[in-house]
């Protein structure tokens, strides 16, 4: 009888713990990946490998639509053949300037620039993909991939994706030699790019 009472007493306690644990899991659970884009990178004349990026179309639909269209080239312009023009170790790698190639160009599918969609997501750690800009509401086509947590960029740059595969390729680019302006000495080129089907949206952790 005593054992039964003890088990009964434990029951409510366990039940009370479950909602709290669920809330903790919800907080840890990040945005849902609704689309994927791949970049096949080349450093100099050597193939460096493939980077697969998950995109959060429910959180930042307009930003994701722009990125996907630039990856497929469906509007007649986009990322294919463009370069990562700025690389800073222990910070990020930046690309997407397919008009000038030096960080001063690029354009969106909506026109030259488009507004910041929202800042719901943060730069939680390595591998998060965010829009480069020249200040408020100046998004075009340039983006960067973090190689460390960059909390100081939160609320200033729109995060819209995360590297799902090929972070080793990102690291390879991060460690390439650069000049005094952070430009790689060997061209880091997006040799090919496009989309990968996502059958069902899935959430990833904020890490």
Curated annotation (Swiss-Prot):
Q: Which GO terms describe its molecular function?
A: cyclosporin A binding; peptidyl-prolyl cis-trans isomerase activity
EC number(s) from the headed UniProt entry: 5.2.1.8
Which major enzyme category is it?
Answer: isomerase
| Signal peptide (from-to) | 1-24
- Cellular component GO terms, alphabetically? cytoplasm; endoplasmic reticulum lumen; intracellular membrane-bounded organelle; melanosome; protein-containing complex
- One Pfam annotation, family name? Pro_isomerase
**Keywords on this record?**
Endoplasmic reticulum, Isomerase, Rotamase, Signal
| Gene3D superfamilies the record matches | Cyclophilin-like
Domain (PPIase cyclophilin-type) ranges:
38-195
What the record says about family reads: Belongs to the cyclophilin-type PPIase family. PPIase B subfamily.
- Protein name, per record: Peptidyl-prolyl cis-trans isomerase B
Question: Which organism does this sequence originate in?
Answer: Gallus gallus (Chicken)
Q: Read off the lineage from the record.
A: Eukaryota, Metazoa, Chordata, Craniata, Vertebrata
